[in-house]
Amino acid sequence: MCHAILGIKWEPGDVVVTTNHEHGGGLTPLNIAVDRYGIEVSMIQVPTGNRQSASTYVQLFDERIRALKGQGKRVRAMMWSSPTYKTGTMLPIADLMEVVKAHGLISIVDGAHLPGMMAYDYGALGMDFMSGAGHKWQCGPGSTGILVIRNKMRASNPLPLPDWFTIHTSSYARQQPRGAYDIAATVTSCGSLHVPMFRALARACEMWDSIGRKKIETYDLTLSAYLKEKIVERWGIDSLYSPKDDPKLVSALTCFNPFRNRDDVMNQQKATTFVNRMLSDFSPGFVIRSVNFEVIGAPAQHYGIRISTHLWHDANDIDRLVESMWNLSGAMA
């Protein structure tokens, strides 16, 4: 995200429209751009739970952009996470790209969880920039990542390419020929490359390819759907922060409120204790995490419990997890 955001040729007063559920990986370079270039950030309050649809996000972004333009603001870009690391909501890239194209904007997607989880064709989606982690669902080494940069005008995005300059490279020639410029070669040229680390990432990618990325996506999402239904059976539909019924919004991340006293989800210490006890009180224990985020209309942040369903899990793992979480939530009531 630093490469994408800080390489753009910003002007003072440029506005980036984003959400209030972004990761620090995107917010940090965005805040640097605010102080360094004088850009402005407009944050949309996003919904949580099952009562939302892909059209919700199209409307939220489009209305905000139109309102800003009506105020005389110069909106330059949209930045969003697909999925959000907080609730696992898959903001619909293809749908939001229609908003991008309608308003002639730069598109920046924090897709940290996409590689290894979803079998997306990034060229067909058409975003200008998409950053993905190499060490999450792709299961490569830590400190590796994937950056997708749109390098041509095509049907998926006929907008002119944004002016962008690499911020970390050991090879740069001035006045590059735009038609033949190998932007990937410049971005990946970094002097003393950590060869074993990146070869390990490439090997992990090859393994995923050999299994079949669409097969992995289907398996992960099927397990996630099973988990969500099991949560609804015990805690009710309102316990979910993740949507489950709109296929455009689902991911293999699930976030919910496990507490019998619903307000306990605003207690950070209780959420931390729940995560710690899920690891310590059961054999084998469970590795889950707590994430904090704003909920529209809530008096304080919620500390939801987030669960990942990977290709090495199965339905029996989900059953044992749900039963254990139910028992622990009862013990903590």
Sequence positions of predicted segments:
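Active-site PLP attachment segment
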Residues: 125-177
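Conserved PLP-binding catalytic core of the aspartate aminotransferase-like
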Residues: 221-225, 232-282
